[in-house]
């Protein structure tokens, strides 16, 4: 369909055409070395539960604020993400949202952005990359959970020292949040179990996050963190402005 073609062309424009120049520019700023740690099934399960909790809570906040902004603007609230995926074939959702998107976004936001900013410390790098990851989605309803997931994915990247962890997690999050509902029948026990899994995983994720907050490992970088250095430059300013403009256009 036309919507599917537009979606795929947008992905090609955002990822395939944008990544090579980004890699070329970032070569002048090598990423500092990171400690390598094993990615175990237990660790993946823990991060998955925490991620689902962040997605659900962030989605509730984002959807409420999105509806409020639409009503203030005198418009009928619209969920652009749900409407878009409802119009796409399952094959396009699997290819775009569950494979191509996670790989390219992790290369860009974690591998390039967070990895290079880690010279100012891993925690500031995670915050900045998560902020841009949230803004990049260019809509209010997705910003909060995208920002929260960006923090988790950056932590997984820094903790393991490999992009394999954030890429796999990103694929799982997108598959569970976007594709599973398209695979389920419209009636029966499976949709009920799927819906029930969200609050159950959210409770488990919050417990794991609270219990593990003091065991978090963030390395310091060789350079002092500087808001002026990170944000007060043409590239960062342009990226933030473009994201805000894209978001604002939804309400016109």
Task: Briefly describe each language-model feature range.
Residues 1-26, 192-200:
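Alpha-helical transmembrane segments in multi-pass membrane proteins
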Residues 1-9, 71, 180-189:
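Juxtamembrane/transmembrane-helix boundary motifs at the membrane-water interface
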Residues 2-3, 31-107, 114-118, 250-252:
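Juxtamembrane helix-loop-helix connectors linking adjacent transmembrane helices
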Residues 17-25, 54-69, 156-160, 176, ...:
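Alpha-helical membrane-inserting segments
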């Amino acid at each position: 369909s036309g919507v599917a073609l537009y979606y795929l062309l947008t992905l090609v424009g955002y990822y395939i055409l944008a990544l090579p120049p980004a890699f070329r520019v970032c070569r002048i700023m090598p990423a500092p070395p990171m400690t390598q740690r094993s990615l175990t099934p237990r660790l993946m399960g823990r991060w998955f539960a925490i991620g689902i909790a962040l997605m659900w809570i962030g989605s509730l906040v984002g959807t409420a604020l999105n509806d409020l902004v639409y009503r203030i603007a005198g418009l009928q609230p619209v969920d652009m993400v749900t409407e878009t995926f409802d119009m796409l074939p399952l094959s396009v959702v699997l290819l775009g949202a569950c494979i191509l998107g996670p790989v390219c976004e992790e290369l860009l936001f974690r591998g390039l952005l967070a990895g290079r900013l880690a010279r100012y410390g891993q925690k500031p790098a995670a915050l900045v990359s998560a902020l841009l990851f949230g803004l990049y989605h260019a809509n209010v309803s997705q910003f909060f959970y995208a920002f929260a997931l960006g923090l988790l994915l950056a932590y997984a990247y820094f903790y393991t020292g490999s992009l394999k962890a954030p890429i796999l997690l990103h694929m799982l999050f997108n598959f569970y949040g976007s594709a599973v509902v398209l695979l389920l029948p419209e009636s029966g026990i499976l949709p009920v179990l799927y819906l029930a899994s969200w609050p159950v995983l959210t409770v488990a994720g919050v417990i794991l996050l609270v219990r593990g907050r003091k065991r978090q490992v963030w390395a310091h970088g060789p350079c002092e963190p500087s808001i002026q250095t990170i944000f007060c430059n043409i590239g960062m300013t342009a990226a933030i402005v473009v994201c805000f403009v894209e978001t604002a256009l939804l309400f016109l």
